Amino acid sequence: MNIYDFDHTIYDGDSSVDFYLFVLCRKPYLIVFLPLQICGTVLFLFGIYSKERMKEAFFIFIRYIPLDKMTSHFWKRNRRKIKSWYLRQKQDSDIIISASPDFLLESVVCGYLGVALIASRIDASTGKYIGKNCFGEEKVARLYEKYPDCIIENFYSDSCTDTPLARLAKNAFLVRKDIIAKWEKI
């Protein structure tokens, strides 16, 4: 099987940030949460907040929007940002593993692309994390939880934080924009 990271790997950008800006343009009153979001980020940078708590502060706005409708509109407009090199080589057995929230990626990954998704589990009604952020070693744990006997043929990511998954793959690739290079020194 082939495994791909999502943001900056097969998607041109950060889907969470793009979604936030998309929502903010349509619901400008949500700017009221910006101080909380900035505070959460600063507390994370100083080691006071966990990554999960910082992201909960960021996603506080989802409680105040029609989430399904907004994600649907967002992906109608933004699925064009899925990179063409991925669409050309996509296989039904692919797995997308991402730190982005499941509520955001599910419709585009499972619906539009028709492949499996492992993502950060977030309660869509509260913005609270269910378990750990799907990042680094947690991606490996979540992969083996869902697919205990999987063999990774090819792995693609834009980030060295995905080295734990890259080490498990027969072939690993670093993606920079549309340039795909063999992952060295794993």
Which residues does each predicted region cover?
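Active-site neighborhood of HAD-like aspartate-dependent phosphohydrolases
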Residues: 1-46
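Generic structural signal for well-ordered secondary structure
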Residues: 12-13, 51, 98, 136
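Short low-complexity stretches enriched in small and charged residues
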Residues: 13-17, 48-55, 71-77, 109
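Short, flexible segments with low predicted structural confidence
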Residues: 25, 29, 57-59, 114-115, ...
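Short, compositionally biased "basic patch" segments
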Residues: 34-60, 112, 116-117
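Active-site-proximal helix-loop elements at catalytic-domain edges
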Residues: 67
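C-terminal cap/substrate-recognition subdomain and adjoining C-terminal extension
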Residues: 70, 74-186
